Amino acid sequence: MRTTVILALALLVGLASANLLVNGDFEQTIDVGWDTVAVNFAGGDTFTWSDTLGQPSPGYAVAVRKYLADYASMSQTVGIPNVNLTLTLDGRLEIGGGSSTCWPVAAFVVRYLDSSGVSLGNTKLYLHDQYCDWAVSDTQSLIDVTTPGVWTQFSLDIADELAKSLPGVAAANVKKLTVDLYAYDNGT
């Protein structure tokens, strides 16, 4: 199985449109501002930084790939002034293969954290196969990506998402966000 997350992104604040992410445009190598981790029970992983990934806008993008179990992740945690933020990104998510014992997921995850860094909940924009058993809850929102392999512009209004989709997450307690490019496969 192969899972790929390819993204160019920005986390914007109000009218000023200031990017809160360090190297959010990926104009520098991915070791600037981003943490990468891979857990390999089987298969391998790759993290790619390039200006030739087919992205619709000029500049650089990154690809996170995971082959078989378990996951590869590229993330960044930032303090936020409030939840009146809009996350925008150009993304292309792809998965390959899949079965009831080995199902892949490609996701862009936003984790909502308190001031101590404790997770309060998350939103996942994700591409998955029919065996994926992730479920919506009062602290987890799942947004299906319906354009596999196609560059798509996504936008997530953080305040609106918390109010409408995450009743178990108090917006006033959200002091940090983690953005995570997440490639996952549950089996071998």
Predicted regions and their residues:
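Extracellular carbohydrate recognition
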Residues: 148, 168-173, 182-188
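Surface-exposed coil/turn segments at beta-strand junctions on protein surfaces, enriched
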Residues: 67-69, 80-82, 101-103, 146-151, ...
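Extracellular carbohydrate recognition and processing domains
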Residues: 120-170
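Sec-dependent signal peptide recognition
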Residues: 2-8
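N-terminal signal peptide c-region/cleavage motif recognized by signal peptidases
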Residues: 13-15
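Extra-cytoplasmic beta-strand recognition segments
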Residues: 26, 72-118, 154-160, 179
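Extracellular glycan-recognition surfaces and repeat-rich motifs
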Residues: 19-65
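Secreted extracellular polysaccharide-interacting domains
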Residues: 61-81, 134-137
